[in-house]
Design a protein with these regions (language model features):
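Fungal secretory targeting signals
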Residues: 1-27
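Alpha-helix initiation/capping motif
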Residues: 2, 42-43, 218-219
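Solvent-exposed, charged interface segments at domain starts and junctions
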Residues: 19-30, 75-91, 211, 223-228
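N-terminal carbohydrate-binding/catalytic regions of secreted carbohydrate-active enzymes
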Residues: 31-155
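Surface-exposed substrate-engagement region within the catalytic domains
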Residues: 55, 59-67, 199, 203, ...
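Substrate-binding cleft of extracellular glycoside hydrolase catalytic domains
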Residues: 99-210, 222-226
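Secreted/periplasmic proteins that engage bacterial cell-wall peptidoglycan
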Residues: 211-213, 217
Length: 238
């Protein structure tokens, strides 16, 4: 969710809490749709991985699905950055996007996911990350993951970035407080995401907070806690 849109929504919903209203924010270049007039950069690594799929279809004389897969190879997708070791993929992606921008003479928008919170995926453990809040994970997340991530994007001022922050994380802690691991991770999640928002403020970066969806937080028992959690998160960032 775009920060300005989220602030507008939360201001309208503010009557559910005792918090004072959010102050209006001035317009800037990041308040427009960052995708307008730009090419969605096609992740060359992902495109390369699909060559195996193309070849498999061709081996079956299935030219139709081979052609469909080639279309996907040239379609912009998000690059997931999920570990400190994976930070090097940002430079690789930036270099490839600059090459494509020079080749086409068209402005590229690079789509990234930032996903490495301490105690990640607290309700399922399916994507357990490298940081633990019990072992200074929040500080390590800030200094060894978010800081270099932000520095890399800010240095590439000639490109535009759309960054999704920590998918599923807020929805997880809002709706899974009955799970001790999630309850204990709540403060870490909120502080980590707030820090990432603050560090990724730049004219060439558009941020989207994964605030779940209506089928998840839209139920009566989830809506008010969800709005309050987002309000507190953004106030902490502001």
């Amino acid at each position: 969710m775009h920060i300005k849109a989220l602030l507008t929504f939360l201001s309208a919903a503010n009557s559910i809490s005792a918090l004072p209203p959010l102050a209006p924010r001035a317009e800037d270049a990041r308040d427009v749709n960052p995708f307008l007039g730009k090419n969605y950069f096609a992740n060359s690594y992902y495109a390369g991985e699909l060559n195996q799929t193309v070849n498999a279809f061709l081996a079956k004389n299935d030219s139709l699905n081979a052609a469909r897969t080639r279309t996907v190879q040239n379609t912009g997708t998000f690059v997931w950055i999920t570990s400190v070791a994976g930070l090097s993929n940002i430079k690789t992606t930036i270099d490839a996007a600059r090459t494509e921008q020079q080749r086409t003479r068209k402005q590229q928008i690079v789509q990234l996911v930032l996903y490495d919170l301490p105690d990640r995926d607290c309700s399922g453990g399916q994507s357990g990350g490298e940081f633990s809040s019990a072992n200074d994970g929040l500080n390590l997340y800030k200094k060894t993951f978010v800081d270099p991530y932000a520095a890399a994007l800010k240095s590439a001022w000639d490109l535009t970035f759309a960054v999704i922050l920590e998918p599923d994380s807020l929805g997880n802690v809002i709706t899974n407080q009955n799970i001790p691991f999630c309850a204990n991770a709540t403060s870490t999640y909120e502080q980590g995401i707030a820090y990432a928002i603050a560090k990724l403020q730049a004219p060439n970066i558009a941020l989207y907070i994964d605030a779940a969806h209506g089928g998840w937080l839209g139920w009566d028992g989830n809506l008010a806690p969800g709005i309050l959690s987002l309000l507190l998160l953004l106030r902490h960032r502001i």
